[in-house]
A protein has these predicted regions:
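Short, Lys/Arg-enriched N-terminal segments with co-localized hydrophobic residues
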Residues: 3-7, 11-25
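Short loop/turn segments at connectors of secondary-structure elements within structured domains
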Residues: 8, 13, 265, 278-279
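Hydrophobic positions on the alpha1 helix immediately C-terminal to the Walker A/P-loop
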Residues: 282
Length: 355
């Protein structure tokens, strides 16, 4: 931690908090539930060092530069593709893996044709040896993140530990990370615990496992976005479905698109479309003149609500299996024209930041 602090400067500035070397962890949160769980992860996976992601642009910039130096990311021609970098995945790791994705609950009756079920204790006994010392020689990144707007009573908080800078940078693109997420959580124990380790990218020991009753997600031996960006399908659909069942709301792999004409009239279209057809693009587009709004909507007591956990940035397309482009741009960029739909299951995304 201290070594990393020297690399990024002796002092950090984070939303009005001045952080000295060596005290970053306690400065980010005093939530004992979070601190105890992260300590448990450190003892299990034994990383050489642990870095807490505070969400500051300076820290993220330093991580990008580190990834360039190690080859985890490659900076592309900045004249032709300004703000773009390239990330490679293994050739055997370019899609979600249905046969290795499990829902583990205590009730065997939860087993059905739509999921792979296993008893939680049996699954943990299988996976714990894979996680043992898996981060030795590596850095553990702790990513507090919020799904939904900060301050919204509908938003949900998660914390993901990972050994991948690619995961850190993409979670910043797709969610609200750092101090603001921890402030949303406060002292609560109501957060999703996500543990990811690339390990050896061994397809025979690749697992993406949800434990709804524990509010936990375990992912190992993958570097592909859908398997390792745990706020996506793992949390926003699988864990959230259980949360919604318990709390009286729904999580759906759908969209409700509001289209507003120049006169201000809004019509809504519902769409239950499969993966890789472009559901996200309309919701993430910010044309020069606003023509549409997208998000999850509902009606309660005569009032309409919506919440889209994705924000700020949207995916378009690049063309090489096993590769991803990550576009770095202004957090305040708004006028972005949509391109072709992203193929989410093929292992490559092009991300552009927008407000």
């Amino acid at each position: 931690m201290r070594k990393e602090a020297r690399a990024m400067g002796a002092r950090f500035k984070t939303e009005g908090i001045t952080l000295k070397k060596g005290d970053l962890i306690m400065a980010l949160t005093s939530n004992q539930h979070v601190l105890d769980w992260v300590k448990e992860m450190e003892e299990l996976m034994t990383p050489d060092k642990t870095i807490w992601i505070d969400g500051s642009e300076g820290q993220l910039r330093a991580l990008r530069e580190q990834a360039f130096a190690t080859g985890e990311l490659t900076e592309l021609n900045q004249e032709e593709l300004p703000g773009c970098v390239l990330h490679h995945t293994a050739k055997n790791d370019v899609a979600r893996v249905e046969d290795r994705t499990f829902i583990c609950t205590s009730n065997k009756a939860d087993d059905c044709m739509m999921v792979n079920w296993m008893d939680p204790n049996e699954m943990k006994a299988k996976l714990l040896p894979l996680y043992k010392n898996v981060m030795a020689g590596r850095t553990m990144y702790v990513i507090p993140y919020c799904m939904g707007p900060i301050g919204s009573p509908f938003s949900k908080v998660g914390v993901e530990v990972t050994d991948s800078i690619y995961v850190v940078l993409n979670m910043d693109i797709m969610t609200r990370v750092g101090v603001k997420a921890l402030r949303q959580l406060g002292d609560s124990n109501d957060f999703v615990r996500g543990q990811h380790a690339r390990a050896d990218i061994d397809p025979e020991n690749r697992y993406i496992v949800q434990f709804p009753e524990d509010n936990a997600i375990w992912s190992i031996n993958s570097g592909y976005g859908g398997n390792v960006l745990l706020g996506k399908k793992c949390f926003a659909l699988r864990i959230a479905s259980y949360q919604g069942y318990k709390e009286g709301w729904m999580a759906e792999h759908m969209l409700i698109l509001g289209i507003e004409d120049p006169q201000g009239n809004v019509d809504y279209i519902t769409a239950a479309f499969p993966s890789a057809c472009g559901k996200n693009q309309p919701g993430h587009a910010h044309p020069a003149r606003s023509v549409c709004q997208a998000g999850l909507q509902g009606v309660d007591g005569g009032r309409r609500y919506r919440l889209d956990a994705h924000w700020r940035r949207w995916p378009s397309v690049c063309h090489q299996p096993g590769e991803r482009l990550l576009r770095r741009g202004s957090r305040h960029q708004r006028e972005i024209q949509p391109q072709r739909p992203a193929h989410h299951d093929e292992g490559y995304h092009f991300h552009q930041r927008c407000a």
